[in-house]
């Protein structure tokens, strides 16, 4: 199982939100690349990077910071937020981003996602509120069940699904293991858990399923409730 530390970018700074609300943003660093460098030094191989401004604007908004992170680390980067067309995908691939996360567009235009997955390294972000898919930076809820959307991308060439329980995101209330497993089973695709991770027990629970491919760690690191180096050791030895 892979642990992916997270950096959310807002106005060029590293922040965390609670339940996806922009007004809840708490700034953790004015220099996100330094945070990424620290993750690398702690033993991380991947970075989960989100352009929050981009998610709401529908186009890249933190390019300079993304370039800085790419230039200063050798981490593999998966990036989401405002990626709605092939031009943006190509721009990020040219920057050296390893994997791109398509979210809202996966609900509106799954055929586009499948076409992109045939050409580029694509992950689908499935964000859910009470089991139903949330779109537009979590500002709206759709009538589609998260498991149905996951099933849509089975055998599509999509590399991974990142599933977020929006109600838990940034709350440190514990990860939703059952939801993550349901997405993995519905899709047959490597599934990465996101939202609510608090401490090492969450990592152990996910690892024990044997079906979860990865977990994103955000606020638990920034608030000190999870020892990231301990978590890396656990998954490497497990």
From Swiss-Prot:
Record key words, sorted:
Amino-acid biosynthesis, Cytoplasm, Histidine biosynthesis, Isomerase
Q: Which reaction does it catalyse?
A: 1-(5-phospho-beta-D-ribosyl)-5-[(5-phospho-beta-D-ribosylamino)methylideneamino]imidazole-4-carboxamide = 5-[(5-phospho-1-deoxy-D-ribulos-1-ylimino)methylamino]-1-(5-phospho-beta-D-ribosyl)imidazole-4-carboxamide
Q: What are this entry's molecular-function GO terms?
A: 1-(5-phosphoribosyl)-5-[(5-phosphoribosylamino)methylideneamino]imidazole-4-carboxamide isomerase activity
Q: Where does the record place the catalytic residues?
A: 8 (proton acceptor), 127 (proton donor)
Q: Where in the cell is it found?
A: Cytoplasm
> Pathway, according to UniProt?
Amino-acid biosynthesis; L-histidine biosynthesis; L-histidine from 5-phospho-alpha-D-ribose 1-diphosphate: step 4/9
The cellular component terms of Gene Ontology attached to this UniProt record, alphabetical and capped at eight, are: cytoplasm
First-tier enzyme category under EC: isomerase
Q: Which residues form the signal peptide?
A: none
Q: What is its main location?
A: cytoplasm
Q: Which domain of life is it from?
A: Bacteria
Q: What is its EC number?
A: 5.3.1.16
One annotated GO biological process: L-tryptophan biosynthetic process
What family classification does the UniProt entry report for this protein?
Answer: Belongs to the HisA/HisF family.
Q: What's the protein name? A: 1-(5-phosphoribosyl)-5-[(5-phosphoribosylamino)methylideneamino] imidazole-4-carboxamide isomerase
Name of the gene this protein is made from: hisA
